[in-house]
Regions:
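Glycine-biased, small-residue-rich flexible motifs in mid-sequence functional cores and linkers
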Residues: 2-7, 92-298
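Short, positively charged patches
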Residues: 1-138
Length: 298
């Protein structure tokens, strides 16, 4: 990569450095803005400045010094491939970055978007259910999803976890647009050609993901796989990104309860289904935290 790095390439280059996570990447970009340094100027800085001012960890510093040429080439290849496939990535400093995410306890420093970006501008809703959601809960969720889609709302879904999967199937089956939040990188979810439908059961209705009709969003590096912490972070991202959250079935004292309390403290819109309140203490906890009761129309 002989020519100067563009802002887009620089962001990708930093994202791929070892041990550069959300907090470090955010700090690097903020310091760069304050110091008004170009990528080329930063790469010429001594290790001491990169360590103290930019807080780059040891492995990242070593990669800059010993693997720079290879990493610049890797960045160029990945930039060309993702761009050719229609992937867009943006930092928290980008005007198109969803402002709602800045309220997250640890917001993504970078987001990778693949598909119809305009879906984020419309009315979005997330239907939440615990990992152990009951068959009755899934049936209620499906009925609610169909009703909301009929009203023109866009579902926020995921390809893993039963409640999200059921909502995803509803959207695909009805040909409705949806926003797919991932718990791994885009290339890991869709394959290198970014065509594979990541949820096997959805392939009955669509063999390949349709970027014209849906939007996939990932806060993870393109080739990152699933980690134990990825699911909770994905849930948090969905909760903050959604225009409204409707809790179908929550486990008492579980993560959904914790997330909804957090959302309510930030003044976000949280509804909780109440028709089985006597059997769902988790839903009751969310209601007691200040959520709005929600009973689907017959």
């Amino acid at each position: 990569m002989a020519s100067p790095l563009t802002d887009r390439q620089w962001l990708l280059f930093l994202t791929l450095l070892p041990d550069v996570g959300r907090k470090t990447l955010r700090h690097v970009l903020e310091r760069q803005q304050v110091r008004r340094e170009t990528p080329a100027e930063i790469l010429r800085l001594p290790d001491e400045t990169l360590r103290e001012e930019y807080r780059l960890p040891p492995r990242a510093l070593r990669a800059l010094r010993e693997e720079r040429a290879a990493r610049l080439e890797e960045t160029a290849r990945l930039d060309a491939h993702l761009t050719r496939c229609g992937v867009r990535w943006l930092s928290f400093q980008d005007a198109a970055y969803p402002a709602a995410l800045e309220a997250m306890p640890e917001p993504p420093a970078v987001l990778f978007l693949y598909g119809n970006h305009a879906l984020l501008d419309g009315l979005t809703v997330a239907l939440l259910g615990s990992h152990a959601i009951s068959a009755e809960g899934l049936q209620e969720l499906e009925q609610l999803a169909e009703s909301l889609m009929a009203q023109g709302l866009t579902l926020l879904v995921s390809a893993t976890q039963p409640a999200y999967q059921r909502a995803l199937l509803c959207a695909v089956r009805h040909g409705a647009p949806y926003v797919l939040a991932l718990d791994r990188g885009l290339l890991r979810a869709f394959g290198d050609d970014l065509r594979k439908e990541p949820f096997k059961q959805a392939r009955v209705w669509q063999a390949e993901f349709d970027p014209a009709h849906a939007l996939a969003i990932s806060p993870f590096r393109p080739r990152d796989g699933w980690l134990a912490s990825s699911g909770k972070y994905r849930d948090t991202l969905i909760g903050y990104l959604a225009g409204a959250v409707i809790v179908v079935e929550a486990r008492p004292d579980g993560y959904i309860v914790q997330l909804c309390r957090e959302l309510l403290q930030h003044g976000r819109t949280v509804y909780v289904m109440t028709q089985r309140l006597d059997r769902l203490p988790g839903n009751r906890q969310i209601l007691e935290a200040g959520a709005t009761p929600f009973t689907p129309q017959a």
